[in-house]
Structures are given as C-alpha cells and as structure tokens.
C-alpha cells in the first residue's frame, strides 16, 4: 500500500512538473525582464545586495517559482544565470514534496555563486541537485536588512523573496536546476 502511494506521488509530481514546463514556458525576453525586475526588487529590499551580486561569480535568478499541490506538491520556475551583468544561460528549477499541503504560492529565488570552485561545479553538471551536488546557504535577513559583503563566507548563498519581501526559514534542498534552451 505504501509503495503504491509513493508511486502515485511520483507520477503526480512528474505530471505537475511536466505541465508546468509546457504551460509556463517563457521566452528568453520574458525571462530576462523578470530577472531584471527581481534583481531591482532585491537590491531595493537589502542594503549591500547590489555589491554582493557584483562580487559573485554568477547570479542565478528565478523570477517566478510556482509551488502547488494537494497532498503531493510540485514546484517549477524558469530563470537566467547572470555573469558580469549579462545573461549566460537559461535554467529551470523543479522539485516535489509529499506531505500536508494545499494551495498555490509564488516566490522568487536568487542563488549567488561566490567562489570560482562553486561556480565551476554548478556549470559542469547537467542537472544540479541542491543538497547533493552543492549546498546553498539561505541567508535569513529581516526587513530593512543589510549585508556586509566582507563577512559572507559561504561559497553559494541564496535568497527567497515573496511579494512582500524576504522569506524566512525556507530551504531549497531537493530542488534540481537544469539548463534549458531558449
């Protein structure tokens, strides 16, 4: 019985993620516009964020990541990798979960690669699994927060924003990020 539930959950996740990929596929131009808007929102919410992004080897931005489910959930979003302020590729993020959940939510995700090694490790794999291929330290900051770029020591850091601002106590573990063609 338990194995049937797991199998059904996996199939549901794949169906939801697959339909999200087809139904929400944005053009390169739309993704770039969303990335620009998300970065500006991030810079406006966190003092020092612009300097931190400038120091990063690469900044991966997913402007809209939609998560939804009834018992079984899936999450999908498309974004762009920025290197030196320019788009260097397009990516998607997909994850699934099992447990009590009901509804749909949207958020933005920013991942900053702060070291050459972390950035190279991300770019060399086809499908980067957070928690397996690399860890992302989510920085929990309060409203009106600031970042001292000299005190950031993690090789990969992440920020999660909702329409109101930075979100707290969240994880990206289990998310898979893959390069896509646009």
At which residue positions do the language-model features occur?
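Sec/Tat signal peptide C-region and signal peptidase I cleavage site
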Residues: 19-25
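Bacterial N-terminal signal peptides
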Residues: 7-18
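Positively charged n-region of N-terminal signal peptides that target proteins for export
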Residues: 1-5
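Small-residue-enriched, tightly packed secondary-structure blocks
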Residues: 25-182
């Amino acid at each position: 019985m338990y194995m049937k539930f797991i199998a059904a959950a996996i199939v549901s996740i794949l169906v939801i993620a697959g339909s999200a990929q087809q139904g929400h596929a944005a053009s390169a131009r739309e993704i770039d516009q969303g990335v620009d808007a998300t970065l500006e929102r991030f810079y406006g919410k966190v003092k020092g964020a612009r300097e931190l992004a400038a120091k990063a080897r690469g900044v991966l931005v997913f402007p809209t990541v939609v998560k939804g489910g009834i018992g079984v959930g899936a999450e999908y979003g498309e974004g762009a990798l920025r290197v030196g302020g320019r788009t260097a590729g397009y990516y998607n993020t997909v994850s699934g979960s099992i447990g009590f959940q009901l509804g749909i939510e949207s958020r933005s995700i920013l991942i900053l690669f702060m070291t050459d090694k972390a950035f190279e490790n991300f770019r060399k794999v086809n499908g980067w699994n957070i928690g397996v291929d690399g860890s992302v330290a989510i920085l929990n900051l309060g409203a009106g927060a600031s970042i001292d770029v000299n005190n950031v020591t993690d090789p990969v850091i992440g920020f999660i924003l909702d329409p109101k601002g930075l979100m707290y106590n969240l994880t990206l573990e289990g998310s898979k990020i893959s390069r896509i063609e646009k």
